[in-house]
Amino acid sequence: MNKRDFPRVHFYDQDFVDIYDKSWAWIADYWTVGDARKGFPKDKFFHYPPSRTLDQLDQVFASFFLVYSNRLYAASNGLDALYGKQEESGAIRGSYDLESGEPVLTKDNPEGLAAPLFAWAEYNLYHKTANKKRVKEVMPALHKYHQWV
């Protein structure tokens, strides 16, 4: 296997293998460049186009899948886009409108709180990449976020 290619799946059910391969092809179509004027970094991150929001859960779960792309896709850029939206209080809202950069708040969830899964995602990234520098860089944001929660 080429280290600069996606991991290959060898499985008896070719339909399963085809879905796996197609999912990597679809991901290539769903990269969004952040807009610095709206508070997002200029790095590309995964985003499913029908939704016009950047969602915490989507980015956390995307990081679990993208970490297996052999660095063809950055698994942490979506998380970094959310860290970039962190407020002085430590708040990182669960969803942000990509057009305005504003948090999406509802009557049922006026704080925009989502499940606090950032630390879990970062643990997984560290477990797969052993990037100690990243842990050191994101720890202050995670600490502030958990104080807010």
Which sequence ranges carry the predicted segments?
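Low-complexity, Ser/Thr/Pro/Gly-enriched N-terminal "stalk/linker" regions
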Residues: 1-54, 77, 81
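Aromatic-rich carbohydrate-recognition surfaces in CAZymes
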Residues: 52-149
